[in-house]
Amino acid sequence: MAGAARGLLWAALSLCLLPEPLRAAHIKKAEAAAAGGGGGVGGELRYLHAAELGQALRDLVAEAPPGLARLFSIGRSVEGRPLWVLRLTAGLPELPEARQDGEKKKKEEEEEEEEEEGEEGGGGALPGRPQVKLVGNMHGDEPLARPLLLRLAQELVRGWAGGDERLGRLLNTTDLYLLPSLNPDGFERAREGDCGGGGGGGGEGGGEPGGRENSRGRDLNRSFPDQFGSAQPDLEPVPEVRALIAWMRRNKFLLSGNLHGGSVVASYPYDDSPTHRPTGVYSKSADDEVFKYLAKAYASHHPIMRTGKPNCPGEEGETFQDGITNGAQWYDVEGGMQDYNYVWANCFEITLELSCCKYPPTSELQQEWENNRESLLTFIEKVHIGVKGFVRDAITGAGLENATIVVAGIAHNITAGKFGDYHRLLVPGTYNVTAVVMGYAPVTKENIEVKEADATVVDFSLQPTVVAPDPNLTQFTATPAPPSTLTPSVAQVEPPATTSLHQAVQPVDFRHHHFSDMEIFLRRYANEYPSITRLYSVGKSVELRELYVMEISDNPGIHEAGEPEFKYIGNMHGNEVVGRELLLNLIEYLCKNFGTDPEVTDLVQSTRIHIMPSMNPDGYEKSQEGDRGGTVGRNNSNNYDLNRNFPDQFFQVTDPPQPETLAVMSWLKTYPFVLSANLHGGSLVVNYPFDDDEQGIAIYSKSPDDAVFQQLALSYSKENKKMYQGSPCKDLYPTEYFPHGITNGAQWYNVPGGMQDWNYLNTNCFEVTIELGCVKYPKAEELPKYWEQNRRSLLQFIKQVHRGIWGFVLDATDGRGILNATISVADINHPVTTYKDGDYWRLLVQGTYKVTASARGYDPVTKTVEVDSKGGVQVNFTLSRTDAKVEEGKVPVLNTPDTSDPNEKEFETLIKDLSAENGLERLLLASSGKVSPYRYRPYKDLSEFLRGLYLNYPHITNLTSLGQSVEFRQIWSLEISNKPNHSEPEEPKIRFVAGIHGNAPVGTELLLALAEFLCMNYKKNSAVTKLIDRTRIVIVPSLNPDGREIAQERGCTSKLGHANAHGRDLDTDFTSNYSWYSGTREPETKAIIENLILKQDFSLSVALDGGSLLVTYPFDKPAQTVENKETLKHLASVYANNHPLMHLGQPGCPNKSDENIPGGVIRGSEWHSHLGSMKDFSVTFGHCPEITVYTSCCYFPSAGQLPGLWADHRKSLLSMLVEVHKGVHGFVQDKSGKAISKATIVLNEGLRVYTKEGGYFHVLLAPGLHNINAIADGYQQKHMKVLVRHDAPSSVFIVFDMENRIFGLPRELVVTVAGASMSALVLTACIIWCVCSIKSNRHKDGFPTLRQHHDDYEDEIRMMSTGSKKSLLSHEFQDETDTEEETLYSSKH
């Protein structure tokens, strides 16, 4: 009350101090406004048309105290309506020629309406006061913002004048701009009550278009320049957009809200993604945390929005966590305004959907205002978070306009305003902030603490420099320079590069790093720069040193669709150390310069960089500083040369594969690397494939991509002057000369088993080998010289990853990326394949190419592509399915339907996330409790361990015995589920079995570890909990407990315990025809068949065995046709691909070191064929696909190897829990809704499954298009196609019609024939009756009537017959009577 009184007193005093004419005018207008009521300023809320809106805004300005409000127009719409902006802030300076005479008001207002904003517009900026804008009615049929912003302005003006503390503080510290209608033309066409946007009233959405677009039919929120757009938009048809862009360029807006309608949610950048998928892609900006904070600030104060459940008609199931969503994840909007604000204009904008109804009735406006009032005020207040201050010249104290403000770790800079003032929005935390200005030394303020309250004040004082400008450096800024004209051309939309005096920070850590030192160095930078780094290991060396890799990316740990991946590998030969140190220098350089140096920032933002400083850490530790050309430490600890240890195309590598080699091969198969360099020492040259030839002599061995490799090699050597000269080591090799510092590997000397050739031939990666100097292990003091010689080359080579062509291969059916599609270039015999999102990269030199994209089950597409010398060209392909044209309109193609069940959606998202790259790694990292098997458990301990799990986790486990072995040991089965021992047909069921051979107990221990891991993480790890809740998991750890009891540890090849107590190999006892086989079956086999395979309905089975490192799929029986081979092979591949070594296809087992199993997957009969296998029986009679995993070369390795084996297999085991939820699941019912059980589902005209109780079925299928035939007695057969994806389940819902065929014929035909037959029978009966009646009448007359002339005719026939004599006897005398009494002669034949 006291505050209000003081405010009124102040307002009265202010009026008294005004000149008499102005004071009278002010009072008069205030009275008019108060009396007007319906104008939307003082009375009930209502929609105002253009002229009314302009008048209401003018009246409000007149009502406001002096210096508080200003009205101006930023431009005009297509139809010439002004785009009004109301500026509200305290202390506005008077405009030139201030209005002193109230009687001139009307004329001046009319002139004001006709003019548009000049250079100063609504007045100049105020030092240190952040600018906020709220834009409404961008879509003409979404006009709720018009009355809301008008009411907001009214409250602010009257609250400030009335002394309201909050509103006074807001306008005293904030420069607020309100634009009620960006699309006034569309509003005039829209209709009140049109909730759906179609133009009709009452929310029906019918009738003519409802005014969404401007008068030229353009959607303003699809018309802005877009960072992911293929071309610049045409701005000529959208003067509204042109006006807004020009206005934004003249100001330094910091925060903005774009007010829409049609839902209730706060959406934040980015609004689209490089793939432009319609929905489901989280497109993360550099300031993702800030945007989520801002969106929550609005949503949390809105009574509906904060629930996350708008419950809009037709979208009742749509939910948004916390009431916010990433724009692209909701749906893709290319050319949106909020992204333009952030990318091009320094401004943080979010989009606010305020109401389910686009154009709500006037009667609802008051409620909408109450819903949004607090959210609007809170959102405006959030402009004051983060850090703020001034950037000044240290000598003159003048503010430095356009100073760049860089926050370490956030790849988005802002620029200071006209007075050197800046304001950087940040969420609470600790930051390092740098100010950079051309001509001044940059200054960094470290450990700045940002709190939840008002912004932390940080001022910068910069010293001018006298350094000459470097034309190769550009200032990294997100804000373009002000344009020279009001209306920007298309070219002016691009931010122009400006020169900068910023110098990159050079490394200072020049010394030789031994392993411990290197490890600390890597951990230090991973810890100091967590937003752009990730430190991981790809394996261990012989001496168990980690093979570390530092990833540097703006989104570490994530493969961003469309972003290429690059790698550097150093120190492959332990005594060639320059590469090791250069890569550590490069890590330091990239981390320290990210966000401040444009080149580094661009590289990190556009490339996922992986750096392995040392591939041979053991050899390094043996090497000696000063070694010029020696070999000590060159090889690994097993004394093998790692660069002769890779499989070779021309020669058989007989050396056993080394752990370092296997780890790197696995690494290369895991990531979609495009380009690589292997850093060596001993010369100064770049050599490129091939490294050897068929004859093993020094001769040019040309690869299909020879021109590309030469260009790649030159890109490095050109930046190293000494290398480019071509005569590197005159003291050591005086005759050696390499033109331009490059050479073909084999032409120099033959290297069989080299890494660079393996890269090219086995992955999509192009690799060259770089010799960095003549001295292999130079003195530490020489290391800065090597950095100076190579730093430009190292950066330039990374840039080459963007040369050639890149893009996406998409499915025409659903627009999703196609995995493993092939990209072929005519006349270059080297195809590459697509990654998980359908993204690909193909390095090419300048030229014209015919490029073909193809994939199994799709029609190939060929395009002619022009590649220039400047960079990469995006070329996307959309492939149609091979049979789409034949089946179009006849057979429905089904994909996973949208479900309104949020829990179902959440689980589908989980499956997709776990299927993504690093998805399972993230699950494992987030898991609680350390599970690591360390000993083998004999039968007694195994039984006690399983009982312990059952007793400790009774709500999710059930322990039963399937039967007994020969020696009466129990065959235990542990079920893990949220409802154990309770049938839930809709849940897929998976079984893990092990120990069918007792001498291979690794599988048993792995399954016990898996069971413990699942139980320990239930209700602690969200992903594990959801998997258990949605899956029935059965674990049978030991099928042959008798054999296990006699097997011996370290018996790598021993067969002791292989068979059961009767000496029978149980994997030969599952005979094909079980129906007649009974008496001689082993008790273990009988228990497994009767109580596991046939009794329980499983979707997938995984059997663990030993003796190799691979996966087999059915059948083990030779010459057996495999109906669903692709699916079985796919399931096996999923397991192998998630194992670090198995997918390499080189088990490397003793006596089989040359064994090669492509992908680590092979059909059982091709590896070890035999009859009576468990997996053959499971597929044939259990209708369950089963794969057999051979866990290690040694049957019974030492217990010390168990932790490593668990670490290798746990991801693969978990991948099976994810995979069992994919494929196809669905329900079968008739039209009445009755579920149909035991219906037959025939897949691809071969595999059969049967519906369970409730009509449910589930079957695993390989990704691709599959045919489904559904058959049930008494119903018509159904045929359809279903699209199965690699990362999500597909659902089908089959509704049967009654059978319309009888005996295989159409019902109508059968009825017609039956009716005709009945009619014929009736007609025949009638004829017979009539004939009988006539004959009966002749008998009643006495003698029958003779047929006249008939005898003469027959006699003539007889006389003319010239047959045999017997023919004379063949003719009978015929009387005309029918009675038996009159028959005189009867023929006998």
From Swiss-Prot:
Gene3D superfamilies associated with the record: Carboxypeptidase-like, regulatory domain, Zn peptidases
Changes after translation: The N-terminus is blocked.
An MF annotation (GO) of this entry: zinc ion binding
Alphabetical GO biological process terms: peptide metabolic process; protein processing; proteolysis
Chain ranges passing through the membrane: 1309-1329
Enzyme class: hydrolase
Provenance organism: Anas platyrhynchos (Mallard)
Record: residues binding Zn(2+) 1: 139, 142, 260
Covalent lipidation (S-palmitoyl cysteine), chain numbering: 1326, 1330, 1332
Family the UniProt entry places it in: Belongs to the peptidase M14 family.
Protein name: Carboxypeptidase D
Domain free text: There are 3 carboxypeptidase domains. Only the first two domains have any catalytic activity. The first domain preferentially cleaves C-terminal Arg residues, whereas the second preferentially cleaves C-terminal Lys residues. The third domain binds to pre-S, hepatitis B virus large envelope protein.
Domain Peptidase M14: 46-383, 511-801, 935-1220
Location of the active site: 353 (proton donor/acceptor), 771 (proton donor/acceptor)
Annotated compartments: Cell membrane
Subunit text: Binds to pre-S, hepatitis B virus large envelope protein, via the carboxypeptidase-like domain.
Domain of life: Eukaryota
